Amino acid sequence: MRYRKTEIWKSVDWITILLYLIMVIAGWFSICGASYEFDNVGLFDPSGRPGMQMIWIGTSLTLIFVILMLESDFFDIFAYLIYACVIVLLIATIFLAPNIKGSHSWLVLGPIRLQPAELAKFATALAVAKFMNGYGFKLTTVKNFSITLFLIFLPMVCILLQKETGSALVYLAFFLMLYREGMTGYILLIGVCAVVFFVTGMKYSEVMVGITPLGELIVSCLVLLITMGLVGSVRKDYISVKIMLGGIASTFLIGYVVSLFVPVNFAWISIGLVGAASIYLFYLSIRNWVWHYALIALFALGSIGFLFSVDYVFNDILEPHQQIRIKVSLGLEDDPSGAGYNVNQSKIAIGSGGLSGKGFLNGTQTKLKYVPEQDTDFIFCTVGEEQGFLGASAVLIVFGLFILRLIVLAERQDNAFGRVYGYSVASIFFFHLAINVGMVTGLTPVIGIPLPFFSYGGSSLWGFTILLFIFLRLDASRKER
């Protein structure tokens, strides 16, 4: 018998909805605290940000009702069409959007501003979920993996062309979902290594030990260690590991003895050892007809190539404001009144909140507008100042429970479409939370992404609400089958 739509309210996951409402309400109060002015005419006045956010919340509730009343098959049937429409909208935004703070990511329609990048997240998740739900789909085949990456990277490239780097980086969160669906963990390892090598190469690029560049030495030594670890873990070839370790140790020992008489660049010795290890691995690959050795060798050589490309990427590809933010985050440059101003004022606001905070509407740093973007990207510092460590911890706990609940719901799906979409949703929320909180506390560079359900803005709230409640509709439909 056809599942009755009136039963949707019984089958929908009310735990997730409760957590959603808690965060939306807490977010509205945080916006009130961040936007409060001494001559404020009223928190519900639509001319102010709290009043406007209340309107966005009301329209979001309407969106929730519409989504839950739709048949769950709607999202499967029209996934590609929704994705195509959003891609067209992203491309149009590149050419039609005005320059706002250096990016072309907002479509302005009279008093309304819309950021299509926020809507692209759920559209991409739907398209990827539909493709991976295909008959006989296996992520391990080159064709399927390539098409999946294309679906993820196409909107990412469009958003990069809008000069909205922060929103584009969010799409890297899909790799967490791909890992759950069978992608090898070595791809995640490559991503982690790229970040570590970039940060290390940048932070110690100008530090010299004698004539040895410390950054190049550290990275090349890490490459050697990881290469030997991969040979041992992937192939269980401990004899080759011992041979490589012996060669590396003896070469460094000889270099040390020589350095007692003449200056020696140990970085070049280490890089040379990476090359020698790669040649040895290629030899093993050809001799034993095992392609794993060749892949490990390519990883080692690619890592060294990446190391030498760091300066080019940093100086010629990244925008000047991005370069300054990275330098400030790594401690390479002190700019308390420039690029580092936001983060410094944010940390002052959070620190001044103490254990229990200054109370609602009593935050001096936020009330006096010391923190730029304090009701959008830096909204978390308002929580820290007004509610203190306890309030900030409570917000993180609620977010943690929310993401864990999404994972539980994703795992209980009876088809790949719902599971893939669910893990995409959980991954996106996790990425936003980790980067935004890290950004506000100075742990990560400032890339300008909102804190879900807390940051001011209709596009952000709508985007996250649609993203979430499509999944809740898919989850509720399990009882229809």
Regions from the language model: what does each represent?
Residues 8-9, 145, 368-371, 413-414:
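Helix-boundary and loop/linker segments of multi-pass membrane transporters
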Residues 19-22, 28-30, 37-39, 43-337, ...:
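Hydrophobic alpha-helical transmembrane segments of multi-pass inner membrane proteins, especially
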Residues 1-10:
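Short, Lys/Arg-rich, polar N-terminal cytosolic tail immediately upstream
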Residues 350, 354-387:
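Long extracytoplasmic/lumenal interhelical loops at the membrane interface
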Residues 164-169, 357-363, 374-376, 447, ...:
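Transmembrane helix boundary and interhelical junction motifs in multipass membrane proteins
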Residues 225-229, 442-479:
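Transmembrane alpha-helices of multi-pass inner-membrane enzymes
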Residues 150, 339-343, 356, 372, ...:
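Alpha-helical membrane-protein architecture signal
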